[in-house]
Structure formats: C-alpha cells, structure tokens
Design a protein with these regions (language model features):
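Short N-terminal targeting/anchoring amphipathic segment
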Residues: 50-69
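Short, conserved loop/helix-junction motifs that constitute active-site signature segments
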Residues: 54, 74-79, 124-125
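Membrane-proximal helix-turn-helix segments that form the acceptor-binding/catalytic region
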Residues: 108-126
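A short acidic, amphipathic alpha-helical/loop segment
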Residues: 3, 29, 49-50, 69-74
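Active-site proximal beta-strand in glycosyltransferases
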Residues: 78-95, 103
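Conserved nucleotide-sugar phosphate-binding/catalytic loop shared by glycosyltransferases and other
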Residues: 25-46
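Structural motif
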Residues: 18-22, 41-42, 61-65
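N-terminal subdomain of nucleotide-sugar transferases
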Residues: 1-28, 32
Length: 126
C-alpha cells in the first residue's frame, strides 16, 4: 500500500487515508507525508456523509474485507469514484498455502476453492 501512496504523491495527487482500525505502534506515520488520516466506524451511516464530503476520484481498498464493508457505501455516495481493490495479497491463496504447509503437503488447485475465494473474487469483480 505504501508504494501506491508514494506513487500518488509523486504524481501530485492529494491522498487521504481512512481506516476503521485503532492506532497502532506498527503503523506508518503518514503525517510526515502530509496525508490526512481519518478514523471511521464500521456499519455506520456516518461514513456515507464522510465520503460524500471527501468526494474522492479514486478509492483504493487494501483488502477484500474492506471492500465488502465500504465498497457499496462508496458506490452509493460517490458513484463516479473509481473503486480499486489492491490485490497484491490474495487472502484465499495465502490461507490455502498456509493449510498445505501445516499439513506438510503441496498445494493443489482444488484447495483454492473456498468461501474465502468466492468472497474475494466477488470483491474483485465489483
């Protein structure tokens, strides 16, 4: 995600970072990059008002669960915003690899089929 943030900054774009996660000692200090950071509540209509006021041109979701939670709200509130799912890390593939590793076996294609795969692919297609 930081590579994307740096790319947009280098192109002169204004970047806003929005998260529903609590602050952590492990998070990047985005204020050094002059990025506005905001906290939003999950399952709360206040996000709709927030994103309408922000009125972004592009919204990047860092994982499919974030797209599931907020994508439809962005679509409703900012229908012209381009919505992008960052797929540098496919969670269904990571989970399948982890299970195969725990069993000490190779990963087989059939093991990729899961509810997680369907959810993540649905987020990509949206």
């Amino acid at each position: 995600m930081m590579q994307l943030i740096h790319h947009f900054i280098e192109n002169g774009d204004e970047v806003s970072f929005v998260s529903s996660a609590k602050d952590s000692v492990y998070q990047e200090d985005l204020s050094q990059l002059e990025i506005s950071c905001s906290f939003v509540q999950l399952n709360d209509r206040s996000f709709n008002t927030f994103v309408e006021e922000l009125n972004p041109d592009v919204v990047i979701f860092d994982r499919f669960m974030t797209e599931e939670q907020f994508g439809w709200r962005v679509m409703d509130s900012c229908p012209n915003a381009i919505r992008v799912l960052n797929t540098e890390d496919l969670h269904f593939l990571r989970e399948a690899r982890h299970k195969a590793l725990k069993r000490g076996e190779e990963l087989h294609v059939g093991e990729l089929r899961s509810e997680l795969q369907l959810r993540e692919l649905a987020a990509i297609y949206r």
